[in-house]
Amino acid sequence: MEVASAVAEPDACSLDHYLSLPDHSMDERIAAARARLGASTVLLGHHYQRDEVVRFADFTGDSYKLSKIAAETEAKYVVFCGVHFMAESADVLGRSEQHVILPDLNAGCSMADMAEISQVEACWETLLGAGLGAEQVMPLTYMNSTAAIKAFCGERGGLVCTSSNARKAFEWAFARAEKILFLPDQHLGRNTAFAMGIGLDEMVVFDPWQIGGGVPAEKLRAAKVILWKGHCSVHQRFLPEHVDRVRAKYEGIRVVVHPECRWEVCQKADALGSTERIIAEVEEAPEGTMFAIGTEIHLVNRLAKRFAPLGKKIITLDDTGCLCTTMYRISPQHLAWALENLLEGRVVNQIKVTDEVKHWARVALDRMLEIRG
């Protein structure tokens, strides 16, 4: 009777082999591989990446900053420690001979997944069927969307935005059309429009899972902003009572949140802005300032550690901690695997957008980069 069988050791170049190794054994290997690759490779790290990964990045930033770097870099290989839509955008903006690598292909984005191209196309037909002319509505998508959604917007005269330039994108769109269809984050769209003086009663939420988006045709025709029913799973967890709680507990605390948070949370905050803006808020504050920050926990913890010696105390707005699990998927093992394969001449996990989609997605992204000012 067979009571045991041999288990084959994973190939030394396989991802399974790397995943079987401890974190601490990756540091020297990543550093050595990075050094050997030199200027041929650039490592981009989003602010929400775990510390063990982001410390190896050549550049860190929000999605806007990293998209600009991706468009400008001369490196042949772009290793993007972020999520899938970011790597897609880097491929769209990069040169044809560049290779964009996402260390873990499972690093996706739940918000981006909330707007499928077939749903957006059906929404557009619903708007036209409600009596709106194509020239009346400007499709505008948040960076946190697939390349196909970006291409959809680009082909119809629209553009992409990030949380750091959303207002400029809205102004650009309203200079050319009466209405905006904003994809896929309802909260960023609502907060941006409201800050521009557009009332909540001038916005509607289009639910792709309901017939006609769940909005009567007359309300679609009356709305200035049509918001897609999508959200960030991390930022939606922050609630108005979290703001009330920290204010009651810490006198004089400054509450700063990301505009992907609910409108009710943003209205109670002292300031809201992109991750780059949040960092600047902390940098510019005087010694002794205390912050409660409503964004992903890795960035909050990193800021707390960085500014503690400068007399600034930073806590998360929700003390249960809000982790972006898809960002967290990229581990030191994934990064080491991708880099060491490059040393052997193997490009793994390359993100490649089709030429047709790339053309119109680039149009939309270029419009975003041009309006930054």
UniProtKB/Swiss-Prot annotation:
State the organism of origin: Acidobacterium capsulatum (strain ATCC 51196 / DSM 11244 / BCRC 80197 / JCM 7670 / NBRC 15755 / NCIMB 13165 / 161)
The record's subcellular location field reads:
Cytoplasm
Output the GO biological process annotations, alphabetical, semicolon-separated. 'de novo' NAD biosynthetic process from L-aspartate
Role description: Catalyzes the condensation of iminoaspartate with dihydroxyacetone phosphate to form quinolinate.
The coding gene here is: nadA
Which residues are the signal sequence here? none
Name of the protein in its database record: Quinolinate synthase
Cofactor or coenzyme needed:
[4Fe-4S] cluster
The catalytic activity of this protein is classed by the Enzyme Commission as: 2.5.1.72
Q: Which residues bind [4Fe-4S] cluster?
A: 109, 232, 324
> What pathway does the annotation place this protein in?
Cofactor biosynthesis; NAD(+) biosynthesis; quinolinate from iminoaspartate: step 1/1
